[in-house]
């Protein structure tokens, strides 16, 4: 493995800029087909000149700008913007932006391992399958595997934190648990959008054979070198899968494979389908988690409705008791008026009867109200 060498930005690419301000230099790491790696401290003009892309495509890779996940096929390069992985892949080299970023370092290590030249003692049979794959597909596979693994790991972390929090919330509804679940739900929504975008990008590529054909850089390079193609053309694309994926469309499985045919995208299709299934599985996990959160919310709402109904029942009992006591107080108020009447003369026993009858009547009235409410199903039994 060659040691990393710092290479100055290519000044010739910006020679025609005149007095214009040069773009800010950015750190890139370059891996070529021979397994050599270099660190490039190049500005955008140097990168555009090196890989033959326009400024709009390069702007997609700017970490300061918010662009969705994108895989673009150009004449001489594949432009990749997958979350933190921002790369440009050509038929002979791959450039990865910000190689010192914590999330990018594992991608650099994997590229260093997968793109390293084969050892002299290695059997040809062991490396035949990998050697037959074009360089751009090996680099593309590393980036897809990295982003799928990254999003899958984030999903697993979210699941390990969300399910216990949701179970705790169902057992005890508190402000702390509600706030915890709210934060987890917000994180799940953001992660779901990121996974969905990567999945949609892969699905869009799989649905368009022309877009997949644009990613065959080695084939286009060989076609440019040999305009006349025939049966003796370069065999870049074997029919056997290179990534262990056995998924293929029935229409292509039944048709004979013509190597070098510009419409033959079976190898790339198998590559993309494998990681499409992986990212789709991650999205299914997030969908299951979202459904679990929705079920938990429904359960909590049912509990809250039950508590609300209990409070309404209590309010009904208290209101009924208040009405009965008000009638009892009305009787006391009537007899407390300073109006002459004969009951006050030698009829002391009447006081006992008035108090007793009024109390029994109010109690009977309260019981009747409660019984009527139970009969109509307004309160629980």
Swiss-Prot record:
Keywords: Ion transport, Magnesium, Membrane, Transmembrane, Transmembrane helix, Transport. It is a multi-pass membrane protein. Pfam families: CorA, MRS2-like. Gene3D superfamilies: 2.40.128.330, Magnesium transport protein CorA, transmembrane region. The chain crosses the membrane at residues 316-336, 353-373. Disulfide bonds: none annotated. A motif (Required for magnesium transport activity) lies at residues 336-338. It is found in: Membrane. The keyword NAD does not apply. GO terms for molecular function: magnesium ion transmembrane transporter activity. GO terms for cellular component: membrane. It comes from the Eukaryota. PANTHER family: MAGNESIUM TRANSPORTER MRS2-2-RELATED, RNA SPLICING PROTEIN MRS2, MITOCHONDRIAL. Belongs to the CorA metal ion transporter (MIT) (TC 1.A.35.5) family. Magnesium transporter that may mediate the influx of magnesium. This is Magnesium transporter MRS2-I. It comes from Oryza sativa subsp. indica. The lineage of its organism: Eukaryota, Viridiplantae, Streptophyta, Embryophyta, Tracheophyta.
């Amino acid at each position: 493995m060659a040691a990393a060498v710092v290479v100055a930005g290519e000044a010739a690419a910006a020679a025609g800029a005149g007095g214009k301000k040069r773009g800010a230099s950015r750190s890139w790491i370059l891996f070529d087909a021979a397994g050599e790696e270099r660190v490039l401290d190049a500005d955008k003009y140097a990168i555009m000149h090196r890989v033959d892309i326009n400024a709009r495509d390069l702007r997609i890779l700017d970490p300061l700008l918010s662009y969705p996940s994108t895989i673009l096929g150009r004449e001489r390069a594949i432009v990749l913007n997958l979350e933190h992985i921002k790369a440009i892949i050509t038929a002979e080299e791959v450039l990865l932006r910000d190689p010192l970023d914590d999330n990018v370092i594992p991608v650099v290590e994997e590229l260093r391992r997968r793109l390293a030249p084969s050892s002299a003692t290695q059997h040809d049979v062991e490396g035949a399958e990998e050697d037959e794959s074009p360089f751009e597909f090996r680099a593309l596979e590393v980036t897809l595997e990295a982003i799928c693994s990254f999003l899958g790991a984030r999903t697993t972390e979210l699941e390990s934190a969300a399910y216990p929090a949701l179970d705790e919330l169902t057992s005890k509804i508190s402000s702390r648990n509600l706030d915890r679940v709210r934060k987890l739900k917000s994180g799940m929504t953001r992660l779901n959008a990121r996974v969905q975008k990567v999945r949609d990008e892969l699905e869009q590529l799989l649905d368009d054979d022309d877009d997949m054909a644009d990613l065959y850089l080695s084939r286009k390079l060989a076609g440019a070198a040999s305009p006349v193609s025939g049966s003796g053309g370069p065999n870049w694309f074997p029919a056997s899968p290179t990534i262990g994926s056995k998924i293929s469309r029935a229409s292509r499985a039944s048709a004979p494979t013509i190597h070098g045919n510009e419409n033959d995208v079976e190898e790339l299709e198998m590559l993309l389908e494998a990681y499409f299934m992986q990212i789709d599985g991650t999205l299914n996990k997030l969908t299951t988690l979202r459904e679990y959160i929705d079920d938990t919310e429904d359960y909590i709402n049912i509990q809250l409705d039950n508590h609300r109904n209990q409070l309404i029942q209590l309010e009904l009992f208290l209101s009924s008791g208040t009405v009965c006591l008000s009638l009892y107080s009305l009787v006391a108020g009537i007899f407390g008026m300073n109006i002459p009447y004969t009951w006050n003369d030698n009829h002391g026993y009447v006081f006992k009867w008035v108090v007793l009858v009024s109390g029994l009547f109010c109690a009977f009235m309260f019981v009747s109200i409660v019984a009527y409410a139970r009969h109509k199903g307004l309160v629980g039994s």
